[in-house]
Amino acid sequence: MPLQLLKYNPGIVKDVTEYATGKNGPFWVDSDLVRFKNGYPEKLGGWQKDTIFALNPSGNITSTETTIEGIARRMVYWRSNSDGEDRLVVGTHNHLLIIENGSLHDITPLRKTSTGLSNPIATTDGSTTVVITDNTHGAENGDWVVISGASATGGVSADDLNSYYGYQITRINVNSYSIVVPSAATSTVASGGGTVTVKYLIGVGAELGSQSSDPALGFGVGGWGEEAWGTPRSDALAGVNLDNSSWSIDLWGEDVLATVRNGAIYYWDTSAGVTNRAVLVSSLSSANSVPNVARTTVVSFPDRHFIAGGCQAYVVGGGVGNVDNMLVRWSTQEDFSVWNPTSTNTAGDQRLQVGTKIIAMVSAREETIISTDEAIYGMTF
């Protein structure tokens, strides 16, 4: 009996019976993890886990696998012009991280650094909770700190105390907080650690650290009878956060511009290396009238203006004013740090009319798409 060619039509038919498909077929009636190319089924491309390794307190790569800290909100991959290295920047709800050469580097900006703390570490025998004393530290619950220079205390090793990635804190009072280390102390020490430096990462005060938005805004929030009847509570008092923590991340050449939603704008210089953290754009020597607060940012293409949405207004004569959730501002062309409009540059601003706040901005082929909560705008230069 001669062979007969059976040519199946592409696609999966599920809305009629298998018998009925043969009337105009044959058709495929079931599949799993396939796609059709040139009329023929082929298996879907897969994925491979990317192994990343942790760093020790000295910043050297180890053989210990690790994962990113926090819920990833934004990732941007690029290959640097200067050294040809592949890099991935990841903004999570509480960190800004770089994956380079298979290792995980923390470039989260710093809020402040306390140096020369004398024996600020206290341990309790059998407990993994360690108390740090730093007067007027300014940290809030959920913030992160990185300790360096600490010596072994109460049986807790120096490597544990001086962890490269640091620790999330529990605030005790204005002068102290606690961290949880991997191994329990073997003795109680009221004051130890030697001369210690503590770096405080930006956190709650900089709009970073909220894993989810808080929908609990209606009747029944909090305990029954809390405060006086009809008295409105502030967001801070109520613990209410309308937006979760997120990032806008764009490349400026091979460098990184990153903005915390409802927070500040930061810059990371690739050529400076992963031992350096991102810094405020407003702290650069060339900075002029940079917004300190923005909902979102984007670099326009192909003209290269740096655009901020839902940001602080420009104050004539220099500086910034109040936040306007519908205001769009942009830097002068080819300089992300200069935002004061003059007759010789292209910086400027425009307030949008439809909506109450800017939600997102995306750089498209010939324009920048700006979305408010009620409208979509297209912006060109």
Predicted regions and their residues:
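Hydrophobic or amphipathic alpha-helical targeting/insertion segments
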Residues: 106, 174, 253-277
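Residue-level signal for tight coil/turn positions that link beta-strands
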Residues: 93-94, 101, 125-127, 172-176, ...
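Short, intrinsically disordered, charge-balanced linker/junction segments flanking boundaries
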Residues: 105, 111, 193, 248, ...
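Small/polar beta-strand repeat architecture
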Residues: 1, 107-245, 272-280, 284-289
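Surface-exposed, low-hydrophobicity beta-strand/loop segments enriched in small/polar/acidic residues
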Residues: 32, 95, 241-245, 258-260
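Short hydrophobic/aromatic-rich beta-strand motifs
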Residues: 71-79, 85-92, 142-148, 162-170, ...
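N-terminal beta-propeller domains
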Residues: 1-113, 204-236, 267, 290-378
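Active-site-adjacent structural elements in enzyme catalytic domains
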Residues: 251-252, 261, 272-273, 285-305
